[in-house]
């Protein structure tokens, strides 16, 4: 059984955490994650809690993810990769968003940047859609997959519109990770040909038990789970906790391993920068 304060005792399994904001976490968290079997972390660029006012604030943040967090993870034997983008929440400041997106190419060239993200919708606004389209084209230019943030409110409508835009842009759906799915949207994401990400963040998203229900219904093909651990009431060990729940339900080890390792590694390997 997992015991958070004792770090973890768990049957060995390779784990890739495909979405965690480790810049908001402590070194204690890195140590616990390593002991739980997490070998790889993908850290997406996103909102920091306080809306930024200047393009340079984003560039310093991107440098921090690419540089310092990469080294900090390595201290605990964890390989860290990054996704870089202008997030949808702050893209509603059009001038700021344009200035940031204009400079993204120099960050997307970095060899451990493995996707463009998080992009997508927050308020499902025109400004967010404009920023989304520009960054999809950057992903195409750099041969990178997309990590897409689906909105917390009106999620079904938001994902439906995002899929429509991607269809108009003729972006390959096998290179799309539609994240933060719930019971009402998983089927839509999968049917479109995208990968379906799910965030186990019990207070505002889904619990390990709900995630296990989704796996029992939809299987494991093109499915992923993550903690999206950040500065909120989250836990970077939610993937290991969900593994325990899946085992309790009788899901076979090979399927769990595919869900928490093979799938995220296969998706991000489309960048040509991870193996």
Go through each PLM region and give its residues.
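Conserved active-site and cofactor/substrate-binding residues in soluble primary-metabolism enzymes
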Residues: 28, 157, 209, 237, ...
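Catalytic pocket-lining loop regions of alpha/beta-barrel enzymes
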Residues: 133-217, 221-224
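Mid-domain alpha/beta scaffold segments of enzyme catalytic cores
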Residues: 2-142, 148, 153, 160-161, ...
């Amino acid at each position: 059984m997992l015991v958070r304060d004792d770090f973890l005792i768990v049957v060995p399994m390779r784990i890739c955490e495909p979405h965690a904001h480790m810049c908001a976490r402590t070194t204690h968290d890195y140590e616990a994650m390593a002991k739980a079997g997490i070998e790889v972390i993908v850290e997406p660029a996103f909102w920091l809690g306080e809306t930024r006012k200047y393009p340079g604030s984003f560039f310093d943040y991107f440098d921090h993810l690419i540089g310092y967090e990469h080294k900090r993870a390595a201290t605990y034997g964890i390989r860290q990769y990054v996704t870089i983008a202008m997030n949808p929440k702050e893209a509603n400041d059009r001038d700021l968003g344009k200035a940031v997106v204009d400079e993204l190419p120099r960050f997307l060239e970095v060899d451990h940047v493995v996707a463009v993200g998080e992009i997508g919708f927050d308020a499902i606004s025109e400004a967010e859609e404009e920023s989304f389209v520009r960054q999809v084209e950057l992903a195409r230019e750099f041969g990178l997959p997309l990590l897409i943030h689906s909105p917390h409110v009106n999620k079904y409508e938001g994902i439906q519109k995002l899929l429509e835009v991607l269809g108009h842009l003729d972006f390959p759906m096998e290179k799309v990770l539609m994240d933060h799915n719930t019971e009402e949207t998983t089927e839509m994401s999968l049917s479109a040909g995208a990968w379906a990400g799910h965030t186990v963040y019990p207070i505002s998203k889904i619990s390990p038990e709900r995630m296990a229900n989704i796996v029992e219904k939809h299987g494991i093909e093109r499915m992923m789970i993550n903690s999206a651990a950040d500065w909120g009431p989250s836990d970077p060990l939610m993937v290991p906790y969900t593994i325990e729940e899946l085992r309790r339900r009788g899901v076979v080890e090979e399927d769990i391993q595919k869900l928490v390792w093979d799938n995220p590694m296969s998706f991000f390997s489309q960048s040509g920068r991870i193996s």
